[in-house]
């Protein structure tokens, strides 16, 4: 039975089969690249006046069962160490389903690359983008208004049901409240186990809540967007992706109303932000490396990653290889020299264009569960199902609350690498000092 059964208002048609098989989070079968960016979004009437609408704001939140009783909220532990709904036991992968592990924390946690003692709070004056761009941004001190939008979708009853996404949201809400002072009354939570229509994670509700999140944002405010669910890729129609593909997330009703692409999320949650406003986005989904479409992606050494310069080599690379194999060394060298010059100029031009399109004067940070070409795992930690990325972020921050951005990225990877192939990514809307203390 597809999620929302009994709530016919949300379904609108026969139950869809759920996101693609194998936890690869790609588009549903036969739907590759068929969802164009919504025309004229947001839909008429967005954002509603006085949003959140009546009954939507989490009055008196959290409801019973969300209380911060340790990592595993009471009543949400699986029994007997088993998972149902096609999930596997003991970390074995079966039938193409995603991997599930019961892991111990990595013994070398905290030994990652980076400054273990962050340099302190962010500077209070505007910062330049460099390279004579004339652009500036401002770090947020995160002392203003705090708001959070948390989305967790288990797709309950579908053939690609997930187990840890709703738990991720519960754990994240408690973490934000306990460690960074976010009020439950300033959190909007969308999960597919709720009865209120406005809290079901449909495409409409997710977009509406994104707009609520950034509405009336001011300098030094701190906003959080956390998504745990299926993710995928679709063909890039704008030309701002190095890979030629856009990252997407799958709402509960994606079969009816389509997915949400990274360009839309960027336009809704990044572009409206004023200088000095902080948005922290956390994506626990597959193919989520650049899910918020931010131009600066950082390595575990704290430097901006360079684009793949060989991806545009095309026939030039083939000609160079052919010349080499036939003994024409000078021809090979000539071809390769032309390739390097062409690609370097193209990469520089494309990168400058992307920065102009996607950079922001605000302070936007995105931490994602994996690279754009990787999948992200469901885990079993602390006696409950959880997303591996959400677990590693919360565990790392609980154990080392005073650490830098670089240390956080490396420690998350350290926790995951013993059992998972995924590599968390950190991207920014501006050049980031990775040795500053992580705040949100």
From Swiss-Prot:
Q: Which GO terms describe its molecular function?
A: calcium-dependent cysteine-type endopeptidase activity
Q: Where is the composition biased (Low complexity)?
A: 52-81
Looking at the record, which segments are called Disordered? 1-134
* Listed InterPro entries: Caspase-like_dom_sf, Metacaspase, Pept_C14_caspase
EC number(s) per entry: 3.4.22.-
Q: What are the positions of the active site?
A: 230, 286
Keyword check for Nucleus? no
Q: Write out the similarity annotation.
A: Belongs to the peptidase C14B family.
State the name under which the record lists this protein: Metacaspase-1
Q: Which organism is it from?
A: Debaryomyces hansenii (strain ATCC 36239 / CBS 767 / BCRC 21394 / JCM 1990 / NBRC 0083 / IGC 2968)
Task: Tell me the name of the encoding gene.
Answer: MCA1
């Amino acid at each position: 039975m597809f999620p929302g059964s009994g709530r016919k208002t949300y379904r609108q048609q026969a139950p869809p089969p759920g996101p693609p098989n194998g936890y690869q989070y790609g588009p549903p079968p036969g739907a590759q690249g068929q969802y164009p960016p919504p025309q004229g979004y947001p839909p008429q009437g967005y954002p509603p006046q006085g949003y959140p609408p009546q009954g939507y704001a989490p009055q008196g939140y959290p409801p019973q069962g969300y209380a911060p009783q340790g990592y595993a909220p009471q009543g949400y532990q699986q029994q007997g160490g088993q998972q149902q709904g096609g999930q596997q036991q003991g970390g074995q992968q079966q039938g193409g389903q995603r991997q599930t592990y019961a892991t111990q924390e990595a013994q070398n946690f905290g030994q990652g690359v980076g400054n273990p003692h962050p340099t302190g709070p962010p500077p209070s004056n505007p910062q330049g983008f460099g390279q004579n761009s004339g652009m500036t941004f401002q770090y947020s001190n995160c002392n203003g208004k705090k708001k959070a939008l948390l989305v967790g979708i288990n797709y309950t009853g579908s053939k690609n049901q997930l187990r840890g996404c709703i738990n991720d949201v519960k754990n994240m809400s408690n973490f934000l409240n306990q460690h960074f002072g976010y009020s439950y009354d300033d959190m909007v939570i969308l999960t597919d186990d709720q009865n209120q229509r406005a809290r079901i994670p449909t495409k409409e509700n997710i977009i509406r809540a994104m707009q609520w999140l950034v509405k009336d944002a001011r300098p030094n405010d701190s906003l959080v967007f956390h998504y745990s669910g299926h993710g995928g890729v679709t063909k890039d129609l704008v030309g701002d992706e190095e890979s030629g593909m856009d990252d997407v997330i799958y709402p509960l009703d994606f079969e009816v109303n389509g997915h949400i692409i990274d360009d839309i999320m960027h336009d809704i949650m990044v572009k409206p932000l004023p200088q000095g406003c902080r948005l922290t986005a956390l994506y626990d989904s597959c193919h989520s490396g650049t899910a918020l479409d931010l131009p600066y992606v950082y390595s575990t050494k704290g430097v901006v990653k360079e684009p793949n310069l060989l991806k545009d080599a095309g026939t030039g690379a083939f000609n160079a290889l052919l010349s080499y194999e036939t003994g024409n060394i000078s021809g090979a060298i000539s071809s390769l020299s032309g390739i390097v010059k062409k690609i370097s100029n193209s990469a520089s031009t494309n990168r400058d264009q992307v920065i102009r399109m996607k950079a922001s004067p605000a302070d936007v940070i995105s931490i994602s569960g994996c690279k754009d070409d990787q999948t992200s795992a469901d885990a079993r930690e602390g006696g409950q199902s959880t997303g591996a990325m959400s677990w590693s972020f919360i565990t790392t921050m609980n154990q080392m609350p005073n650490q830098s951005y670089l240390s956080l990225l490396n420690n998350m990877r350290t926790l995951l690498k013993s059992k998972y192939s995924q590599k968390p990514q950190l991207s920014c809307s501006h050049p980031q000092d990775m040795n500053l203390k992580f705040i949100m």
